[in-house]
Curated annotation (Swiss-Prot):
Keyword Cytoplasm carried by entry: yes
Summary of the function given for this chain in its UniProt record: Could be a nuclease involved in processing of the 5'-end of pre-16S rRNA.
Family membership: Belongs to the YqgF nuclease family.
Gene Ontology molecular function, alphabetical: nuclease activity
EC number of the protein: 3.1.-.-
Taxonomy of the source species: Bacteria, Bacillati, Bacillota, Bacilli, Lactobacillales
InterPro entries: RNaseH-like_sf, YqgF, YqgF/RNaseH-like_dom, YqgF/RNaseH-like_dom_sf
A single BP term in Gene Ontology: rRNA 5'-end processing
Identification of the protein by name: Putative pre-16S rRNA nuclease
Annotated keywords: Cytoplasm, Hydrolase, Nuclease, Ribosome biogenesis
Compartments (UniProt record): Cytoplasm
Top EC group: hydrolase
GO cellular component, one term: cytosol
Primary location recorded for the protein, binned into one broad class: cytoplasm
Amino acid sequence: MRIMGLDVGSKTVGVAISDPLGFTAQGXEIIQINEEQGQFGFDRVKELVDTYKVERFVVGLPKNMNNTSGPRVEASQAYGAKLEEFFGLPVDYQDERLTTVAAERMLIEQADISRNKRKKVIDKLAAQLILQNYLDRKF
């Protein structure tokens, strides 16, 4: 069963896909969205769902370090609710605290990637970390 991991921001959604057995996550792409205009990138998400035969979504929850929920948590949950309604597939949530920080550190320390290039892949890598954390927790 393939699972799609999503790192939801106000302008982009990082996408990761699990392998068919659900053991590993791979970063796939970054989808441009516009929350204010109600553009959530679902046309592209649908193409990916159909291509990979996705059966479940995992949406990252950007909780505060003290475990409280802020406005981005609410936005991520609203995005998850829209996914569930639009696709009719189950949506789980994964604590994503520090995933973007970890992703950026990996890109700097291990790949020595410039700031401009990091901006282009950071959300995809964060989605991969969110999904991998979810998969590790489940198995």
